[in-house]
Amino acid sequence: MLQYCLLRRYRFLLRQHAQVIKRCYSGDIRNIGILAHIDAGKTTTTERMLFYAGKTRSLGEVHRGNTVTDYLAQERERGITICSSAVTFNWNGKRINLLDTPGHIDFTMEVEQSLYAVDGVIVVLDGTAGVEAQTVTVWTQADKHKLPRLVFVNKMDRPDANFEKCIVDLTEKLDAKPICTQYPTKSADGQLGIFDVITMEQMTWQQNDLGRNYSKVKLESSTELQEKRNELIDQLSGLDDELADVVISTESFDKVSNELIGQALRRATCQQKVVPVLLGSAYKNIGIQPLMDAVNAYLPMPEERNQMYDCFGNDFAGKVFKIVHDKQRGPLTLVRLLRGELKRGMRLLCSARGQAEVVSKIYEPLADEYREVGSMQAGDVAICAGLKSTVTGDLLTSSHTSLKNAQKRLLQSRGAAMPQDEDEVLDDASHELFSIEPKIPDAVYFCSIEPPSISSQTAMEQALKQLQREDPSLRVSYDSVTGQTVLGGMGELHMDIIKSRMLSEYKIDVDLGPLQIAYKETLGSSAITTLSVDKDIAGSKQSVSITLQLVSDQRELFSLDKSPENVQHLNALRPRILGVLRKGAVSALERGPRVGGQVVDTQIRLHNVTVGRGTADSFVMAAAAQCVQKLLITSGTRLLEPIMAIQIVAPNERISGIMADLSRRRALIRDVTSKGDRNKIILVNAPLAELSGYSSALRTISSGTASMTMQPCGFSEMNTADESLAVRRAQGLD
């Protein structure tokens, strides 16, 4: 009974302590990301925010190559965002930390990393296109992170913009519940204005002062706008009890104040029940100030997110979400500060590796410019210099004691009893709850990379190491057969950017070999074998006998045989031996026998193993790998080729030529829909192997009038003829 009372008292104190920590947070911070399909106007929107917030003195334009957030030479040259960039600015008493992310599928890893650091996002739609392919991808990523979001429908000044279609797309393609807080209107001369549904006002921007000022005119007599406001209140009252009570008590929508609507909309947005929709034209300087007002009003404060980290109390905790390399400052680590205070000269511990490092300097972010500060508080985003070993996904704490105490508090707050093997359970809790290791997508292409001279080999390896630390989706490996360094990447553009950055940033003019498709392999048939190995190594006898089976299975990678003759022996195996066997066996699946592709949808089943006394773990691991390699050759493998989902927008008169070309590329037409009166949208799946140089071919076929986007959508088995051709190409015989 005493123990129970003490536990109750401890949990009460823990809850009180958490409230104190929350009060230490600043409610005046908003950490947001901005997401979009390529060319929707995301970077232009960001540049306008910086300008109206007084952070920049002139408007940055993508086509002029003078943007703040697109600062890499490759970004300004191509007019696209490649690397996420962080900027900080103040707006109406709030401090906004904004991460501008890429829209191109080749750099989707940048988006994934950024979403670990934000509390909400703005999704920018092209008002002329609605929800596009990459919009779906970034929306799914935001769903995974359970992020509240706003939608900004951009380019609404254009004559072909369709606001209603965008709303339908949000509902049908993204399964969202949009709440329209604004509607478009146009003057007699075609200038875009905005109706504010909540305040019943019309907003009009002045073009002679770059959109700094705009006028508001009350429209209380507008029946149409009043109906829109009533519709908004009706939608919200069905989702928010507090607003519903007010509506019921007043028996009128007209008596619901703007403040009550805003509060209800904020609650529903933070709970991800609705998505407020705003509109404008970033390029024409329309609608940006209300968008920033909406960020302050509707997106959550830091204290409303990441509540799991309350267990750190006043101790420092932060998570690393990005690393960049600066020529003068060296590696710079972007850290989301979760709890406590970060100070210059502070000693930080990496929870994953137990390695301590010292923060030499702290900077406030503004893309590639930095303002040094002495300290920063929880809820903010900081750039740290001096952290040379930290990698993306690391949790940083002030000490080992702080980490252990936080893990104990978390377990106890959840009612978990402290087990006997405390360290093991705490390590599991650390991995499960405190790790943000991003899921790295599979490479789509790979190619060899060679330095211009032997003397440049070391410099090239160091440069690749730094680029890989910045970009986890860049794979770097060594082919022991050819002796070459091999790069794996997300697409042709990704590889081209790596080559360009090697030259511009590291002054190494590398040669890239021809791009190869990253095929996967799958099991041809089930097979079982026993491998026995006995060797004397440095006077020590090493022996192991292992029986493994390979079977087709998409669920489990490694399992134990359940047959009566083996189950007792296998259950008696030490966990360490099982771990070594698993690691060795699974490693052999990384390179299949046909083209060196990863072997997937295959289960390794352990039937029996005997390990001699004194046999080294490395010997057991090597034997397990050798046994699996032998089985793969015996059973044979089939190739799986990557399939791309393509969206093509083209004029009606060009469709027949495009369709004929697609049929020659083994493409599967999924859908063809109209876009206005003059264009059509073609949705198609096609093998990546058939799409080399397709963007150039499409420009030729359409005389430059068609546009396309594509992204990976899975793998598919190949027929015998195509598989044989792929093997010959991989072996350099065709």
UniProtKB/Swiss-Prot annotation:
Q: Answer yes or no on keyword DNA-binding.
A: no
Database matches in InterPro entries:
EF-G-like_DII, EFG2, EFG_II, EFG_III, EFG_III/V, EFG_V, EFG_V-like, G_TR_CS
Q: Which residues form the tr-type G domain?
A: 27-303
Positions of GTP binding = 36-43, 100-104, 154-157
For this UniProt record, give its keywords in alphabetical order, as a comma-separated list. Answer: GTP-binding, Mitochondrion, Nucleotide-binding, Protein biosynthesis, Transit peptide
GO biological process, any? mitochondrial translation
Tell me one Pfam family matched here: GTP_EFTU
Subcellular localization: Mitochondrion
One Gene Ontology cellular component: mitochondrion
Give any GO molecular function from the UniProt entry. Answer: GTPase activity
- Name of the protein this chain belongs to: Ribosome-releasing factor 2, mitochondrial
Q: Which gene encodes it?
A: mRRF2
